[in-house]
Curated annotation (Swiss-Prot):
<comment type="similarity">
    <text>Belongs to the eukaryotic ribosomal protein eS4 family.</text>
</comment>
<dbReference type="InterPro" id="IPR013843">
    <property type="entry name" value="Ribosomal_eS4_N"/>
</dbReference>
<dbReference type="Pfam" id="PF01479">
    <property type="entry name" value="S4"/>
</dbReference>
<dbReference type="InterPro" id="IPR000876">
    <property type="entry name" value="Ribosomal_eS4"/>
</dbReference>
<dbReference type="InterPro" id="IPR038237">
    <property type="entry name" value="Ribosomal_eS4_central_sf"/>
</dbReference>
<dbReference type="InterPro" id="IPR002942">
    <property type="entry name" value="S4_RNA-bd"/>
</dbReference>
<keyword id="KW-0689">Ribosomal protein</keyword>
<dbReference type="InterPro" id="IPR014722">
    <property type="entry name" value="Rib_uL2_dom2"/>
</dbReference>
<dbReference type="GO" id="GO:0003735">
    <property type="term" value="F:structural constituent of ribosome"/>
</dbReference>
<feature type="compositionally biased region" description="Polar residues">
    <location>
        <begin position="19"/>
        <end position="32"/>
    </location>
</feature>
<dbReference type="GO" id="GO:0006412">
    <property type="term" value="P:translation"/>
</dbReference>
<keyword id="KW-0699">rRNA-binding</keyword>
<dbReference type="InterPro" id="IPR036986">
    <property type="entry name" value="S4_RNA-bd_sf"/>
</dbReference>
<dbReference type="Pfam" id="PF00900">
    <property type="entry name" value="Ribosomal_S4e"/>
</dbReference>
<dbReference type="GO" id="GO:0022627">
    <property type="term" value="C:cytosolic small ribosomal subunit"/>
</dbReference>
<feature type="domain" description="S4 RNA-binding">
    <location>
        <begin position="43"/>
        <end position="106"/>
    </location>
</feature>
<protein>
    <recommendedName>
        <fullName>Small ribosomal subunit protein eS4</fullName>
    </recommendedName>
</protein>
Length: 244
């Protein structure tokens, strides 16, 4: 049987729950193309412009604006209206002199926060591998791979990056300009579970072997709760290191 290629259509009703779109106005919606974020954790650029920002009345208008290169994601012009945007992406509209950060609301749905500083972004280290020459490749949450060259690959102390840490990338250069370690006392942004969208400080880490680590956190008003490590996104010490 011949390969039909990737699907190009998506019905509105079974679309990801974190999409803030009307489910019954039309049968189909825009399906995100393959990219840095999975479909379940991203939103196509067309829907960002039309449904979230309201800067276009219909799909035709949104496509026109995008194809003209008037929308930047992490400082790069994206002309594909199906390009998937996801957590911590910085979306800029130079003509309107506006920038937005992709975050999550209290129901885990994708939303945009208006920001003033669009020159850097945070990326979570999901995994890391050793490449030729003993250097380190960081696999980040938004699909990118960042190479860290070590002066002396035989010295383990030169590798300061750990899984769960976050790196600060410059925009649009996409180079590492900072590092926030995972650990107690750090400020975290919660990306899943009952406290999704909240900020809280890590006050305890319970290591597990066969299951995800359990992290105990405390909000600004003193409420304590627990969640798994996968839902913890480090954003700084006492306050976020980027505009949120």
């Amino acid at each position: 049987m011949a390969n039909k290629g990737p699907r190009k259509h998506l019905k509105r009703l079974p679309a990801p729950k974190n999409w803030q779109i009307s489910r019954k106005t039309n049968k189909y919606t825009t399906r995100p193309s393959a990219g840095p974020h999975a479909m379940g954790s991203s939103l196509p650029l067309l829907l960002v412009l039309r449904d979230l920002l309201g800067y276009a009345d219909n799909a035709r208008e949104a496509k026109k604006v995008i194809k003209m290169g008037k929308v930047l994601v992490d400082g790069v012009k994206r002309k594909d209206h199906r390009y998937p945007t996801g957590l911590m992406d910085v979306i800029s509209l130079p003509d309107a002199n506006e920038s937005f950060l992709v975050v999550l609301d209290e129901k885990g749905r994708i939303k945009l926060n208006k920001i003033k500083d669009n020159t850097k972004k945070l990326c979570k280290i999901e995994n890391k591998t050793v490449i030729k020459g003993g250097h380190i490749q960081l696999n980040l949450h938004d699909g990118r791979n960042q190479i860290v060259k070590l002066a002396d690959a035989t010295k383990a102390e030169e590798d300061i990056y750990k899984t769960g840490d976050c790196v600060i990338l410059s925009i649009p250069e996409q180079s590492i300009v900072g590092h926030v370690q995972f650990g107690e006392g750090k400020l975290a942004y919660i990306t899943g579970g009952k406290h999704v969208g909240d900020f809280a400080k890590i006050i305890g880490i319970e290591k597990k072997q066969l299951y995800p680590d359990i992290i105990t956190l405390e909000t600004e008003n003193g409420e304590q709760f627990k969640t798994i490590r996968d839902y913890v996104f480090i954003v700084g010490d006492d306050k976020p290191v980027i505009s949120m």
